C-alpha cells in the first residue's frame, strides 16, 4: 500500500522567521475517503518550555503536551494542504497524517518528524556585527604600536612589585564612535567582549587581565566606566545600550558561560559548582592545545548552576541586552542550554543566542542550533583559505545556515592574527568574501579591521587599533553592508551555490533571490599577490546585456570568447555582478538611509504582528487564502482600525488586491497608552484587548503581571 507523501519532507530541517507561513502538503491515496491532519508542536512553545523548566527544577516529566493536531484542507483528489502562521521563536516539529474513514489507525508518511526552526522576525536580514573590545577604545585607540620607552617604564615598575594597570577605554568612549560604526560603516549589531569585573592585583594575566576571567556575571567592570558621582558603571553600560537602540541597532554582550576567573563570586560561594582535577585543584578549560590557567571551569552537572545562569541571562535582558555571544558554549551540555533558553524565552522571546563553537565538534554545534534553540553560531570560513579548502567547507556551511541556524562569517576575531598584518589587499579580500558569502547578512568584524590594524588583539592587554588610519577600508565596508541590507539575494530564502569552472585560485558564488528571482554573481580572487581569471558556465549566470558590479558601482565587460564566461580579477579583488541596473539604485538608496531599520526587517515584523492579531481573535487556523500584504498595509496605516476589522471578520486577509478602507463601526479592542501623556494616570486594559503603545522616540517597555 502506498504511504502518504509530505512536503516539506519528513526528517528535513527547515528554517523560517516569525511572520512566515509554513506550507505543508500531503499526498494521500486518492481512492480512499478520509481526512488529513498535521500533528505538530507549532503554536505551543509555552507548553514545551514549562515541561523543560519543570524537569530541571522539580523533576517533572516531559509529557509532550505541546503536540496537537490541526486539520488540513482538502485541495483535490487525495491532496491536502495547510498554511500555518509561525508566531513563536523556537524549535518545533511536525508530521502530517491521513485518517481513512472508518479506520482508527492513521497513515503516516515514511520518515521521522519534520524540523521547523523559527527565528526572530527582525533578524531576517542585515545581521551585520561589529565586535567591540571596550578596553581598546581608550588612549591607545589611534596608536600604531606601543613605544619601547613606554614599555621600559612600565617594566621597571613591574620589577619593583607594583601592579600597573593603565586607563581603559570606557562605554562612553564607544558611544562617541557609534555614529561612525553604525552610521558610516552601517553595522546593525554591536557585540561587546565581556564587560564583567576581572582580577586586578591577583590571578591576573597580562597588563589588564582577561575579560573572559569574569568575577561576577551580574556585575560591570568599573574600569569600563568614567568616574561620575551621578552614575554607576551599570548606568553607563545602560547609556551605551540606549545609544545603540536609539540608532536602531542591537546590543549583544559576551558571557563566558563555561568558566569564571579565579576567586569569582561563584567560586567563593559555590566551589562545588566547579570542575576539579584528581588532586582537587580547580580545573582550567582549554582548546587547540592551550590551557587558560586564569580560568576555572564550571561543572554543569549541578542543576542549581543552570538556574543561576538562566537568571544571569534574564537579568541582562532586563537591562536592555538583545542577544548574547556564548563563549565556549559548546562545552555546556545540551539539557542545560535547553533549560536556560526556555527560561529566557518565557520572558524575552526574541533574544538572540550566538554560539561560539570554534574548537568543538560540528555535530554538537548543529544539535545545539537545531534542538536546544540557540540561534546562530560562528562559521569556520575564516579558517579556510584556498579554493580547495573553501570548496570543501562552504557547501556544508550553506546547508546548515539555511536549515538549522546561520553560521556567521567573521572576517577576523579576537583569537586570530590581524588580516592586515599580511597585507591590506588581503584584509579587503577576506572582509569582502566574509560579507558577500554570508547567509542573510550574517557577517562580522572585530574593531580595527576597518583601519587595517596590524597588531593582534591580546585579551590581556589593550592593543592599539590604528584608529583613523589614513589607509583604511571604511568606504569598502560601508558599501558591503549596504549591499547586504538592500539586495534580496542576501535576504531569507536565497539560494547559494558555488559555480566556478576552470583552473585558478578563484571562486564564483551564485546567489539567487527568493523574493523576485534576481541573481547576483560573486567572484573572488583568493590571491593577494597576483591577478587571476574566474570562469563559469553561461547557463548558470547568463550575460545577455550590460553587467554591473555592486561593489564598485561600475559597468564591466565579460569575456565571452571561450566556452565558459571569464572575468579577469586583480589581486585580491572581489566583485558582485548583477544584470539589473536597478540593483545599483537599490544599493545606493540604502547607502543614503543612515541608521534606519532595513525595509525587509520592518516588513517581516509587521507580518508577524498582523498574523498575531488575527490569530488572537480567530485561532491558529489555515492561512491558505491570505493576502498578507493587504494586512500589513492596513496595520501600518491605522493599527486601531486594523484590530477592529480583524476582530469583526478578518476581511483584510483576503486575496483582493485593494480591499478598501476599513468601514467597521464601534469601539476597537485596543487601549492606547501614550508617552508622556499617560505617565501620571492609570490606563485600564480590558481582558482580551490589545495595548497600543505610542511614543515619539524609540523606547523599551516592560509588561509586568
Across the structure, where does each feature detected by a protein language model lie?
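Surface-exposed beta-strand/loop patches in extracellular or lumenal glycoproteins
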Residues: 27-29, 36-40, 526-544
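The substrate-binding groove and active-site-proximal loops of carbohydrate-active enzymes
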Residues: 135-139, 153-172, 213-234, 262, ...
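Active-site-adjacent "subsite" loops/lids of carbohydrate-active enzymes
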Residues: 263-319, 329-330
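Glycan-recognition and catalytic regions of carbohydrate-active enzymes
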Residues: 454-520, 526, 630-631, 639-662, ...
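Active-site-proximal helices and loops of the catalytic beta/alpha 8
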Residues: 241, 311-314, 322, 327-407, ...
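N-terminal structural segment of carbohydrate-active enzymes
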Residues: 2-250, 258-260, 572, 579-582, ...
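Aromatic- and acidic-residue-enriched segments that line the glycan-binding/catalytic groove
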Residues: 147-149, 198-218, 257-287, 342, ...
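Aromatic/acidic polysaccharide-binding cleft in carbohydrate-active enzymes
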Residues: 405-475
Amino acid at each position: 500500500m502506498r504511504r502518504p507523501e509530505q512536503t516539506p519532507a519528513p526528517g528535513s530541517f527547515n528554517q523560517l522567521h516569525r511572520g512566515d507561513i509554513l506550507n505543508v502538503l500531503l499526498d494521500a491515496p486518492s481512492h480512499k475517503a478520509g481526512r488529513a491532519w498535521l500533528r505538530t508542536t507549532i503554536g505551543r512553545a509555552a507548553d514545551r518550555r514549562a515541561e523543560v523548566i519543570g524537569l530541571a527544577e522539580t523533576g517533572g516529566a516531559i509529557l509532550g503536551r505541546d503536540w496537537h493536531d490541526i486539520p488540513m484542507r482538502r485541495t483535490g483528489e487525495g491532496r491536502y494542504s495547510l498554511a500555518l502562521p509561525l508566531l513563536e521563536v523556537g524549535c518545533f516539529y511536525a508530521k502530517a497524517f491521513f485518517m481513512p474513514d472508518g479506520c482508527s489507525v492513521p497513515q503516516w508518511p515514511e520518515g521521522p518528524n519534520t524540523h521547523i526552526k523559527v527565528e526572530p522576525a527582525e533578524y531576517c536580514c542585515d545581521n551585520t556585527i561589529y565586535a567591540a573590545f571596550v578596553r581598546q577604545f581608550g588612549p591607545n585607540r589611534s596608536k600604531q604600536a606601543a613605544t619601547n620607552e613606554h614599555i621600559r617604564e612600565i617594566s621597571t615598575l613591574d620589577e619593583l612589585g607594583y601592579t600597573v594597570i593603565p586607563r581603559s577605554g570606557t562605554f562612553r568612549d564607544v558611544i562617541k564612535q557609534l555614529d561612525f560604526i553604525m552610521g558610516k560603516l552601517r553595522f546593525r549589531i554591536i557585540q561587546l567582549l565581556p564587560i564583567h569585573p576581572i582580577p586586578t592585583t591577583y590571578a591576573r594575566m597580562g597588563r589588564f587581565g582577561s575579560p573572559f576571567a569574569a568575577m561576577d556575571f551580574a556585575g560591570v567592570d568599573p574600569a569600563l566606566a568614567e568616574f561620575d558621582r551621578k552614575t554607576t558603571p551599570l548606568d553607563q553600560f545602560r547609556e551605551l545600550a540606549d545609544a545603540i537602540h536609539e540608532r536602531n541597532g542591537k546590543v549583544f554582550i559576551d558571557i563566558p558561560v563555561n568558566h569564571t576567573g579565579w576567586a569569582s563570586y561563584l567560586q567563593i560561594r559555590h566551589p562545588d559548582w566547579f570542575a576539579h582535577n584528581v588532586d582537587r585543584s580547580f580545573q582550567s578549560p582549554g582548546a587547540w592545545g592551550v590551557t587558560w590557567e586564569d580560568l576555572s571551569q564550571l561543572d554543569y552537572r549541578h542543576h542549581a548552576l543552570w538556574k543561576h545562569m538562566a537568571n544571569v541571562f534574564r537579568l541582562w535582558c532586563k537591562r536592555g541586552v538583545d542577544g548574547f555571544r556564548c563563549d565556549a558554549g559548546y562545552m555546556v551540555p545540551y539539557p542545560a542550554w535547553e533549560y536556560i533558553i526556555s527560561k529566557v524565552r518565557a520572558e524575552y522571546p526574541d533574544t538572540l543566542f550566538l554560539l561560539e563553537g570554534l574548537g568543538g565538534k560540528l555535530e554538537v554545534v548543529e544539535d545545539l542550533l537545531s534542538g536546544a534553540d540557540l540561534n546562530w553560531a560562528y562559521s569556520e570560513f575564516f579558517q579556510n583559505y584556498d579554493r580547495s579548502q573553501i570548496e570543501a567547507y562552504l557547501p556544508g556551511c550553506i546547508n546548515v545556515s539555511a536549515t538549522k541556524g546561520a553560521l556567521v562569517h567573521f572576517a577576523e576575531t579576537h583569537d586570530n592574527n590581524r588580516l592586515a598584518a599580511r597585507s591590506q589587499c588581503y584584509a579587503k579580500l577576506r572582509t569582502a568574501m566574509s560579507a558577500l558569502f554570508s547567509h542573510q547578512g550574517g557577517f562580522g568584524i572585530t574593531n580595527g579591521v576597518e583601519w587595517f590594524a596590524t597588531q593582534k588583539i591580546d585579551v590581556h592587554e589593550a592593543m592599539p587599533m590604528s584608529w583613523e588610519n589614513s589607509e583604511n577600508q571604511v568606504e569598502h565596508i560601508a558599501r558591503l553592508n549596504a549591499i547586504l541590507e538592500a539586495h534580496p539575494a542576501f535576504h531569507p530564502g536565497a539560494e547559494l551555490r558555488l559555480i566556478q569552472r576552470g583552473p585558478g585560485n578563484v571562486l564564483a558564488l551564485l546567489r539567487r533571490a527568493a523574493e523576485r528571482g534576481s541573481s547576483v554573481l560573486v567572484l573572488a580572487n583568493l590571491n593577494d599577490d597576483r591577478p587571476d581569471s574566474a570562469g563559469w558556465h553561461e547557463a548558470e549566470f547568463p550575460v545577455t546585456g550590460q553587467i554591473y558590479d555592486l561593489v564598485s558601482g561600475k559597468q564591466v565587460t565579460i569575456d565571452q570568447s571561450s566556452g565558459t564566461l571569464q572575468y579577469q580579477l586583480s589581486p585580491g579583488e572581489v566583485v558582485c555582478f548583477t544584470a539589473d541596473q536597478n540593483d545599483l539604485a537599490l544599493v545606493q538608496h540604502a547607502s543614503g538611509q543612515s541608521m534606519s531599520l532595513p525595509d525587509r526587517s520592518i516588513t517581516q515584523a509587521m507580518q508577524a504582528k498582523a498574523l498575531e492579531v488575527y490569530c488572537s481573535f480567530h485561532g491558529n487556523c489555515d492561512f491558505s487564502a491570505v493576502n498578507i500584504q493587504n494586512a500589513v498595509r492596513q496595520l501600518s496605516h491605522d493599527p486601531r482600525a486594523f484590530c477592529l476589522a480583524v476582530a469583526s471578520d478578518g476581511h483584510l486577509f483576503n486575496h483582493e488586491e485593494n480591499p478598501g478602507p476599513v468601514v467597521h463601526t464601534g469601539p476597537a479592542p485596543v487601549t492606547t497608552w501614550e508617552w508622556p501623556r499617560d505617565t501620571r494616570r492609570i490606563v485600564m486594559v480590558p481582558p482580551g484587548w490589545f495595548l497600543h503603545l505610542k511614543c515619539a522616540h524609540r523606547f523599551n517597555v516592560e509588561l509586568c503581571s
